[in-house]
Each structure stands twice: as C-alpha cells, then as structure tokens.
Amino acid sequence: MSLTDTPNANRLHIALFGRRNSGKSSLINALTGQDTALVSDTPGTTTDPVAKAMEIHGIGPCLFIDTPGFDDEGELGRMRIERTWKAVEKTDMAILFCGGDTSAELSKETKEPDFTEELYWLEQLKAKGIPTILLINKTDIRKDSQALAIKVRESFGDTPVLISAKEKTGIEQIRRTILEKLPPDFGQQSITGTLVAENDLVLLVMPQDIQAPKGRLILPQVQTIRELLDKKCLIATCTTDKLPETLHALAHPPKLIITDSQVFKTVYEQKPEESKLTSFSVLFAGYKGDIHYYVKSAAAIEMLTESSRVLIAEACTHAPLSEDIGRVKLPRLLRKRIGEKLQIDIVGGTDFPQDLTPYSLVIHCGACMFNRKYVLSRIELARKQNIPMTNYGVAIAFLNGILDRIEY
C-alpha cells in the first residue's frame, strides 16, 4: 500500500461464501478485471482467503475476500473452513453463492436443489447483522437458471442475482446490488467526533521514538491529520520535548491536544487548563471499537492481582522493539501497579483466542490495521464471555489516574 492508497482497514469488506467450485474466484476476477484468484475446475482450489482491493463507483474503496468452500472435506478441509469462519468476522457485506457445481447442490434423495448448507450460512451471517446478496452463478451452462432462482426465492425469501462470472454477464447487477445493500452506517464513523469543529486549533504531540517509522508518520497520525484538514481545523504539531515551546508560540491555547498514549502523563502535566486532552489510541477506540465498553472495562484493572492473567492483543505482527508499547511499556506499567508475577499473554495479527475465559482482562491496541467490523466481533466475543476488554490508550490513562479527564 502506498501513502496515497486507502488502507484496507478503511475499505468495505465484501466476502464471497459458497461451496467449492461455485465460481467465487471467477467472480473476484470478473469484478476486478484481473486474474487475482486462482481458478480451476478442481474443487478446493482456494485454500486460504484471498483479498483484492478495488474501487466501485458510487461506493468507493472496497476489499473483496475470496474464501475456501464451506463444503470442504477431510482434515485439511476442516482447517480451510476455519479460515472461512475467520473471514466472517471481518465481513461488512456477504455474497452467498446458492449452489456449487451445477450438480453438486442436488439432494441425493429428491434430486431437487438442497440448500441446507447455504441456509445455515445465511442464518449465521444474519445473526451477525451482515447484509447478504444471494447469487446464482454459471448461467452460461445451467439450463435451469430461472427454475433454480424460483427455488432460491422460495427457500431463502429473497431474490438471487443471476450471473455468469466466466462470461461476465450480470456483473453490473452485482455492483448495483452491493450499492443497494450497503450498510447505512458504513463510513459514517469519525475519528474526532464532536470534539472539534471548523477553525478549532488542535495540537498533535507525536513522539518520534524508535517505534516511529523513519521518514513518515504512523497510520493513526496520518488519518487523524487528514480528518482534521477535512474539518477545516487549524493544526499544530510537535514532539514531546518541544511541547512547552510550542504552547508558548501559539497565540492561544489549543481547543484539543491529541498525543501518543505513552506520554499521556507528561502532556497532561504541561497542558493549559482549558485545553482538552485525548490520544490517538483513545480516539481509535471509538473509531474502530466501542469506547464506552472500553472505559467501563478499564475499571477491571483495579481488580487484578498477581494471580490474574491478562491478554494483550495487537493488530500488527511487527518484530518487537526495545520500547514496544504493547510488549514492553504497557506490561511494565501493569506489573508496576499489580505486581511482577502478573501473567501477561501477547498475541498479534489475526491470532486471537476464541476462549477468553482464562483472562481477567483483554487489552487491545488501537487497531488501525483492522476494519471496524473485525474489532467489534472481538468485543462481542469478550462480552458474551463476560470478559472486560479495553484498549491501550484507555488502559494507560487509567493507570496514570487521568481517565476521567480524557476526552473521547
């Protein structure tokens, strides 16, 4: 991804689900106009989810996800289906193929279309609030496309889109249907919310330490600056050591100061009384997750003991650095508060345990590399198991005793 590309985390995630050899990969290629996904008559060609970014007129940046067939078999097949389930957690919108190969969906007893698996997956997608487009592919070789469409409508209660991915017919209808079923709240989230308005002065305090990539800013900083520019705010920036000089140079105190969570305490002690304070991580807690649940869950820190177990989850999978906030600084703060024997497990990327019951608390990063749907799915998992879940910025503010004075 270049600096001018929309991050995948901010794209509408559209996942394709269906049986093996149903034409999911062919549709990806037809939609993107490229041979993105491997296509073969052999069932099970797609062994891992394949993602392709593209723009759709009227919608904007999208990420299409081609998943392994949910009717896969054997031990390897079971593992592939698990990958497909993981893709569901990131899905904003689904395209469900009704049937696989032209004969595979027929019941052995009745010789009628058997949509048992498709109906099960539709039920699971609906339970997660994922808008789903029903689709019948291979109309170029099916003699019963219209009859099958009637059966789908009767079984699913919705009208399918008929296409031939191979001949590229019906592709425009798919694009129109995506636009029609677009989640109404998608893309409506704001990083800074109602904290600032046009002409407000905002000061960004950004430490350029070993974690900061040389020659560029980290993604949350870039996205926040872009939003502030769109809001027509006045923006000033500085490093932590130049905060006093910067405040002195400003004609009046900033309306809002946004800092890195790891220097919360330092900035709080130096900020003007009338300036509001928050951090990039706290802002992203609301932008990507559920800030109110995070703030409520932070109180669980007070209940931790040395026999407790805490899970720290990072979206990135970078090699740990000497002063890494998630792997070094945050554990140091926790153990200083709770005790050196506090057990802390750390996971990165898509590694996230489905069973959270061994943990007294989950602390997540700002998740700038994940889409909102994926973060909310993790929060929902924690909620269902009654496990408190907060994020880096909220936890650090709590540990510094200033959470009630932080804006979000």
Where do the PLM segments sit?
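Conserved C-terminal guanine-recognition region of P-loop GTPase G domains, centered on the G4
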Residues: 52-60, 65, 75-159, 190-194, ...
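C-terminal end of P-loop GTPase domains and the immediately downstream helical coupling element
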Residues: 164-251, 312-313
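Conserved beta-strand segments of the P-loop GTPase G domain that flank and frequently precede/overlap
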Residues: 95-100, 134-137, 162-164, 204-206, ...
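Conserved G1/Walker A P-loop phosphate-binding module
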Residues: 1-78, 82, 86-89
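Conserved nucleotide-binding/hydrolysis micro-motifs of P-loop NTPases
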Residues: 44-45, 69-71, 100-104, 138-143, ...
